[in-house]
Amino acid sequence: MKTLLLTFLVVTIVCLDLGYTLICHRVHGLQTCEPDQKFCFRKTTMFFPNHPVLLMGCTYSCPTEKYSVCCSTDKCNK
């Protein structure tokens, strides 16, 4: 009986972990990422000279541009 309960506990823990989704900051608020999006990012880009634009959110892969940050824990891209 104890073995059955232990097995049930392990299966429950594994199943709960499979449903985890990452939460990232956006410029305004939070974003719940899609299951395949494993990273949060923050990057600053210049669309016009002397006018930096901040981009934040979920991503499938880390950006490689200069002035970018990539991380993989909840709300890590503030």
UniProtKB/Swiss-Prot annotation:
Site, Key residue for inhibition of muscle alpha-1-beta-1-delta-epsilon (CHRNA1-CHRNB1-CHRND-CHRNE) and important for inhibition of neuronal alpha-3-beta-2/CHRNA3-CHRNB2 nAChR: residue positions: M46
Site-annotated residues for Key residue for inhibition of muscle alpha-1-beta-1-delta-epsilon (CHRNA1-CHRNB1-CHRND-CHRNE) and important residue for inhibition of neuronal alpha-3-beta-2/CHRNA3-CHRNB2 nAChR: F48
Residues flagged as site, Key residue for inhibition of muscle alpha-1-beta-1-delta-epsilon (CHRNA1-CHRNB1-CHRND-CHRNE) nAChR: T44
Keywords: Acetylcholine receptor inhibiting toxin, Disulfide bond, Ion channel impairing toxin, Neurotoxin, Postsynaptic neurotoxin, Secreted, Signal, Toxin
Chief localization: secreted
Compartments where found: Secreted
A cellular-component GO term for this protein: extracellular region
Xref: Pfam families: Toxin_cobra-type
Signal peptide positions (record): 1-21
Tissues where the protein occurs: Expressed by the venom gland.
Any GO MF annotation of the entry: ion channel regulator activity
UniProt superkingdom: Eukaryota
Classification via InterPro entries: Snake_3FTx (IPR003571), Snake_toxin-like_sf (IPR045860), Toxin_cobra-type (IPR054131)
Function description: This three-finger toxin binds and inhibits the nicotinic acetylcholine receptor (nAChR).
Family assignment from sequence similarity: Belongs to the three-finger toxin family. Short-chain subfamily.
Protein name: Short neurotoxin SNTX11
Organism: Ophiophagus hannah
